[in-house]
C-alpha cells in the first residue's frame, strides 16, 4: 500500500471548516484544535530564516544551555557492542516500544543536543519505553560502511538483550534517514528480523546532486540546507562518507535499489525541502511496501527537528504517533 498525502496548513484548515456550516453540509463541524505557531507565506519564511540564523550563529548571550533530561527521566551514556549510545527513558512507560534514533548531519557530525531534545519528544509521541540515540562513526575519519556497521551492531545488541523486533521503531532524519533505510535493507538481505516500522524525516535518498530537481528548484527556499546556510557551499561536493563508491551505488543511494520486504515506513518532507525530489522518488520506489508519504507545504528540511514550535512540526509529530499506533497496537 502506498499512501501519498499533502498536509493542509492549519490556517487553511480552520478557514475551510469555518465556512462548512454555510455550504449545506448540515450539522456544524467543530474546528479542530490547532497546536503551535501558525504562520503563512512571507511571514512564515521570515520567521524560519530568523530561527535558522540564530541556530547556526547564536549570539554569545543566547547560546542554549546544555541538554538536561526532564525530571524523572533516566538518561545514561553507555555503549552497545562498543558503539556509543545514549539512552533516554520516561519515568512511567506504558508500552514496550523502543526507538532507535539515527541522527542526521551528512555523515559528517556526531550526536548533538538538538537530537537529545528531539528524542524526548519522540519518546513522548511514540509512547516509547526507551529511546537509544546512536553516536555512529562518521566522515571524514570513517567512510562507508562504518555507520551501517554501527547501526547494525546496536540493533542486534537490542535483540540480544531481549527486545523484540516487533517493538522497535527505527527513526532517521536526513543522513540518518539514509542510514535507517540502509539498515533495513541490510537486515532483509541477511535474513535478520525487521523492526516494526521506519520513520524517515527528510531522508537523504540520493548521494548524487542533480540539477533540475528540488536540489536546485528549492535552493533559495530551503532555509535549513539551501542558500545562505552553512551547508550551501558543499551541496555539489562529493560526500566524503561515500569513499570510493560511485554516488549512484544502491548502498549509498537507496532510491536506486529494491525496497521490497522492508517494514512499514512513514516518509515526511517539506514542500521547500532541498531533498523533496529524491524523497518522492524513494516513496515511489517503495510502492510494494506499506509506505505513507506526506509533504508539508512551504516547510524546509527536517522542520520538526529544528522548528518544533510551528504548527506543522507538531502535526508531523502527531502523524508519527498515529502511524506508530496504527502499526504497533498497544
Question: What does each model-identified segment do?
Answer:
Residues 1-11:
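N-terminal Sec-pathway targeting helices
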Residues 11-19:
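Bacterial N-terminal signal peptides
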Residues 19-29:
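Bacterial Sec-dependent signal peptides at the C-terminal "C-region" and cleavage site
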Amino acid at each position: 500500500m502506498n499512501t501519498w498525502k499533502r498536509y493542509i496548513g492549519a490556517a487553511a484548515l480552520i478557514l475551510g471548516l469555518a465556512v462548512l456550516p454555510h455550504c449545506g453540509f448540515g450539522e456544524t463541524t467543530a474546528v479542530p484544535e490547532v497546536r503551535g505557531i501558525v504562520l503563512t507565506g512571507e511571514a512564515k519564511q521570515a520567521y524560519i530564516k530568523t530561527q535558522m540564523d540564530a541556530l547556526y550563529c547564536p549570539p554569545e548571550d543566547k547560546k542554549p544551555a546544555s541538554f538536561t533530561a526532564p525530571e524523572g527521566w533516566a538518561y545514561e551514556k553507555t555503549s552497545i557492542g562498543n558503539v556509543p549510545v545514549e539512552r533516554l527513558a520516561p519515568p512511567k512507560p506504558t508500552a514496550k516500544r523502543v526507538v532507535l534514533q539515527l541522527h542526521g548531519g551528512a555523515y559528517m557530525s556526531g550526536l548533538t543536543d538538538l537530537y537529545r531534545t528531539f528524542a524526548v519528544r519522540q519518546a513522548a509521541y511514540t509512547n516509547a519505553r526507551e529511546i537509544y540515540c546512536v553516536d555512529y562513526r562518521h566522515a571524514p575519519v570513517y567512510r562507508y560502511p562504518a555507520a551501517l556497521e554501527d547501526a547494525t551492531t546496536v540493533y542486534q545488541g537490542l535483540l540480544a538483550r531481549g527486545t523484540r523486533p516487533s517493538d522497535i521503531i527505527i527513526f532517521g532524519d536526513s543522513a540518518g534517514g539514509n542510514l535507517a533505510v540502509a539498515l533495513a535493507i541490510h537486515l532483509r538481505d541477511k535474513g535478520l528480523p525487521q523492526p516494526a516500522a521506519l520513520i524517515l524525516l527528510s531522508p537523504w535518498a540520493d548521494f548524487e546532486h542533480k540539477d533540475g530537481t528540488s536540489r536546485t528548484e528549492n535552493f533559495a527556499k530551503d532555509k535549513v540546507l539551501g542558500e545562505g546556510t552553512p551547508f550551501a557551499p558543499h551541496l555539489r561536493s562529493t560526500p566524503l562518507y561515500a569513499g570510493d563508491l560511485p554516488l549512484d551505488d544502491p548502498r549509498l543511494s537507496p532510491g536506486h535499489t529494491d525496497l521490497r520486504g522492508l517494514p512499514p515506513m512513514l516518509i515526511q518532507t517539506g514542500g521547500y525541502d532541498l531533498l523533496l525530489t529524491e524523497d518522492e522518488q524513494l516513496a515511489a520506489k517503495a510502492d510494494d511496501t506499506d509506505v505513507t508519504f506526506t509533504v508539508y507545504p512551504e516547510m524546509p528540511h527536517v522542520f520538526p527537528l529544528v522548528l518544533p514550535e510551528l504548527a506543522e512540526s507538531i502535526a508531523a509529530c502527531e502523524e508519527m504517533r498515529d502511524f506508530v499506533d496504527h502499526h504497533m497496537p498497544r
